[in-house]
Regions:
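Pepsin/retropepsin-fold aspartyl endopeptidases
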Residues: 1-136
Length: 136
C-alpha cells in the first residue's frame, strides 16, 4: 500500500508560506457501527493520537466512563486530556489499526495523528513537494 496526501496551505507568516501535513483517517465508534471521517495533522512530535473533545461525543465515547484523566505538555503548555481505556479502531486508506487515543478537554487544538501505534507502523515520508506518503 502507498497512500499520499497533499499538505494543506494555511496562509503566511513572517517566515513565509505555511503548509501542514494532513491525512484523512476513519475513526470507528467503539459502541456502534459508525465510522467518522476526519482530517488529522500528521505530527511526528505527538507521542500518541490526540483528538478534539467533540470527536468523543460524535463517536459516543463518554469522557468520564470510557476514559482516564491525564495530562500532556507541548508548545502550548500543559493540558488536561482524557485517555481512552481501550484502543480505537482506525483506517488509513484500506489499512486498519487499533491505536491508543486521547481527547483534549477542548476543541481549540486540531486532531493530531501520533507515532505510537499509528505513524510508526508505516514507512512515512515528508516530501519537499508538500506531500506526505504512507507505505506499509
Amino acid at each position: 500500500m502507498e497512500l499520499k496526501f497533499n499538505f494543506e496551505y494555511r496562509g503566511e507568516s513572517h517566515f513565509g508560506k505555511i503548509y501542514r501535513p494532513y491525512a484523512r483517517v476513519l475513526l470507528k465508534s467503539p459502541k456502534q457501527e459508525l465510522w467518522l471521517n476526519e482530517w488529522l495533522i500528521v505530527d511526528t512530535g505527538a507521542d500518541f493520537t490526540t483528538l478534539p473533545r467533540y470527536i468523543a461525543r460524535e463517536l459516543d465515547i463518554d469522557l468520564k466512563g470510557d476514559c482516564m484523566n491525564g495530562s500532556t505538555s507541548g508548545v502550548g503548555g500543559k493540558q488536561v486530556i482524557f485517555l481512552l481505556k481501550k484502543y480505537l479502531e482506525v483506517k488509513l486508506g484500506e489499512t486498519t489499526r487499533r491505536i491508543p487515543v486521547a481527547f483534549f478537554d477542548n476543541n481549540q487544538v486540531p486532531g493530531l495523528m501520533g507515532r505510537q501505534g499509528f505513524i510508526e507502523t508505516f514507512d512515512t515520508e515528508f516530501l519537499k513537494a508538500h506531500v506526505v506518503v504512507f507505505k506499509s
